[in-house]
């Protein structure tokens, strides 16, 4: 295999710290696997090599790619040896093909030992794993942890669900809240923050502390740990037991870390301890692709690596073998607007292709229709569905595209779970209002809307499965002001009855005051009310396409069935389908044709991004999206969203589009 000079410098590096800055499509995985091969060829004990990645899938893929390389090398060696024997039998002279596979004619004791085994067999003893799996292995060895003592994700969710059921805390979207709390606790542990000074992003501090302390108590009483505890405990173990640290330092002489830009503080501290005293630490990453700050990733760690490890050799893998010249130049113009980064000169290996296409559409419906039509045109021109991807800033924005692809009968797969808009609690509230306006008297519908906005209704007032307004008034007969509220609700429902779905949604939000309820709930959850308004806006936009509530409700049911069908088909990995993905989930992937949609302010950069560091992270995320494309790149924005004007993302202009 041919390597460029930068790749050769990286894979031939032997001792001491090295930082490999790997631009998009620069062949970093190839460099890592070939460096492992070179270390083994040099006689390094395979059990002393540790390769760390961030996901189990990445670790598995890295190991498989290395073993595949090793098998190929073993086969080449075998063929060379057979050729040498034939040459000797026919009296031929020794040639370069006869040289020992692992290096010089006199490899030394360890090299001679290595020559006696296959590269694949040696490679099977190299350790590949995630931070969590490696640290758990260390803790299991030190503390004799029994199998199954790591708390599962489902066990976590069940604990928090039980807590909410038994507390006075009310949340609308239980699954979303629990997921947010789990991530927040992980962040607090990973950053080793003091709860006394921590300001929760999801709920009032007293509730977060109760959730955190209760979860911690569950772990203690059950004798379990979570992934974040592994990092903390491993750090404490190495700090307190220098003898144990020395044993692991002696074992792992060479440490390679992939995607180093995603490392967090605690992971870095443990790896630094483990790499001592030789500091044979080989890190590979791209600070321009650091997009997980919300999980605790700190790109500044990579930026400060050379200061922490004096004498570090740095090499830039600056040749992009993936994308056309136009795509490389467009993405580079964008990322150069970031101030806190390594300066890089990136060059395309490929020549010119088609210009990057940027278009602005009137509204999201027009945007998604055109993208769907373009996808079909690409397929008609000979592209496989699987060669095409549509990328979004968030999964919530992918629902409309999924609906359009269903309508055009275009097969697709989801790299993220698309939230079903119609199963959102706001949708359920709006549907309940409309059901009652249409004549439903089911108690479950009244339970949903009775205090949204707050009318001070008690659940005890709805004491029968079928609700009667007369009975409700009777319950409050000694409170005139409550009877007045009941009459107001009746009048609102009568006013809604003849309205088309979109008019009914707007009436509920403005005339009834549902938006006021959303504001108060957002304040409790430490959210921006705009996040909830956006969901209500999407529902209004959907409702506008239907003449009656019955039609809208039937559409929602069909959409839910289609989503279930798509999720079931996700197991069929070989099926030819268009990819719908968030920008985060697309990292590390590539497609001949890529559509980056919704390139508008408030979406990318996200409206939550306020600080300069947040904007730089959003720019890196957009950069990741652009650099997924091999041949054709389309970027799309809209002029208007939910009947309000919206600006094109600043990143579009920065990229020169």
Located regions from the model:
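Conserved helicase NTPase motor core
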Residues: 1-12, 16-20, 50, 58, ...
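Helicase P-loop NTPase motor core
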Residues: 20, 24-32, 46, 310-313, ...
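Long, highly charged, low-complexity intrinsically disordered interaction regions
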Residues: 391-450
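Conserved helicase C-terminal RecA-like lobe
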Residues: 402, 432-657
């Amino acid at each position: 295999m041919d390597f460029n000079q930068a790749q050769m410098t990286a894979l031939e590096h032997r001792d001491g710290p090295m930082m490999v800055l790997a631009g998009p499509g620069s062949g970093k995985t190839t460099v890592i696997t070939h460096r492992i091969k070179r270390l083994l060829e040099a006689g390094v004990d395979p059990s002393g090599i540790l390769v760390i990645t961030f996901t189990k899938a990445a670790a598995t893929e890295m190991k498989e790619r290395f073993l595949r390389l090793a098998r190929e090398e073993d086969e080449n060696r075998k063929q060379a040896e057979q050729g040498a024997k034939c040459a000797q039998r026919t009296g031929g002279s020794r040639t370069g093909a006869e040289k020992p596979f692992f290096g010089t004619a006199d490899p030394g004791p360890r090299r001679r030992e290595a020559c006696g085994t296959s590269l694949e067999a040696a490679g099977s003893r190299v350790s590949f794993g995630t931070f969590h799996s490696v640290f758990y292995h260390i803790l299991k060895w030190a503390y004799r942890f029994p199998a199954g003592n790591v708390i599962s994700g489902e066990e976590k969710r069940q604990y928090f669900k039980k807590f909410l059921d038994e507390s006075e805390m009310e949340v609308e979207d239980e699954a979303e809240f629990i997921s947010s709390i789990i991530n927040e606790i992980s962040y607090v542990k990973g950053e080793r923050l003091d709860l006394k000074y921590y300001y929760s992003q999801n709920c009032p501090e007293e509730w977060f502390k109760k959730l955190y302390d209760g979860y911690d108590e569950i772990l203690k009483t059950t004798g379990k740990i979570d992934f974040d505890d592994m990092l903390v405990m491993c750090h404490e173990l190495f700090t307190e037991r220098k003898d144990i640290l020395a044993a692991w330092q002696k074992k792992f002489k060479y440490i390679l870390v992939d995607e180093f830009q995603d490392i967090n503080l605690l992971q870095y501290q443990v790896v630094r301890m483990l790499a001592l005293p030789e500091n044979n630490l080989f890190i590979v990453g791209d600070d321009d692709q650091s997009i997980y700050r919300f999980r605790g990733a700190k790109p500044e760690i990579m930026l400060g690596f050379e200061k922490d490890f004096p004498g570090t050799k740095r090499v830039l893998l600056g040749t992009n073998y993936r994308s056309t010249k136009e795509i490389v130049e467009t993405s580079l113009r964008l990322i150069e607007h970031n101030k806190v980064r390594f300066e890089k000169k990136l060059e395309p290996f490929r020549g010119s292709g088609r210009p990057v296409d940027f278009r602005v559409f009137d509204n999201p419906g027009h945007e998604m229709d055109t993208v769907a039509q373009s996808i079909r045109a690409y397929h008609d021109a000979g592209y496989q569905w699987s060669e095409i991807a549509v990328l979004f800033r968030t999964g919530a924005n992918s629902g409309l595209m999924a609906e359009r692809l269903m309508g055009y009968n275009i097969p697709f797969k989801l790299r993220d779970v698309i939230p079903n808009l119609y199963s959102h609690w706001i949708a359920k509230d709006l549907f309940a209002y409309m059901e009652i306006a249409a004549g439903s008297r089911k108690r479950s519908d009244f339970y949903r809307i009775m205090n949204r906005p707050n009318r001070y209704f008690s659940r005890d007032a709805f004491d029968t499965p079928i609700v009667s307004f007369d009975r409700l008034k009777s319950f409050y007969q000694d409170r005139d002001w409550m009877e007045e509220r009941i009459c107001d609700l009746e009048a609102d429902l009568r006013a809604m009855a003849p309205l088309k779905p979109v008019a009914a949604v707007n009436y509920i939000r403005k005339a009834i005051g549902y938006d006021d309820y959303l504001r108060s709930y957002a304040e409790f959850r430490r959210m921006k009310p705009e996040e909830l308004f956006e969901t209500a806006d999407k529902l209004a936009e959907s409702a506008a396409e239907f003449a009656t509530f019955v039609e809208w409700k039937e559409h929602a049911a069909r959409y839910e069935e289609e989503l279930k069908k798509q999720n079931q088909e996700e197991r069929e990995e070989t099926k030819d389908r268009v990819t719908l993905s968030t920008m985060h989930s697309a990292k590390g992937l590539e497609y001949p044709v890529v559509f980056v949609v919704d390139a508008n302010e408030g979406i990318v950069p996200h409206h939550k991004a306020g600080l300069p560091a947040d904007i730089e992270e959003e720019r890196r995320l957009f950069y990741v999206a652009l650099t997924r494309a091999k041949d054709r790149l389309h970027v799309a924005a809209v002029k208007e969203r939910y009947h309000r004007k919206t600006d094109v993302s600043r990143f579009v202009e920065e990229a020169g589009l």
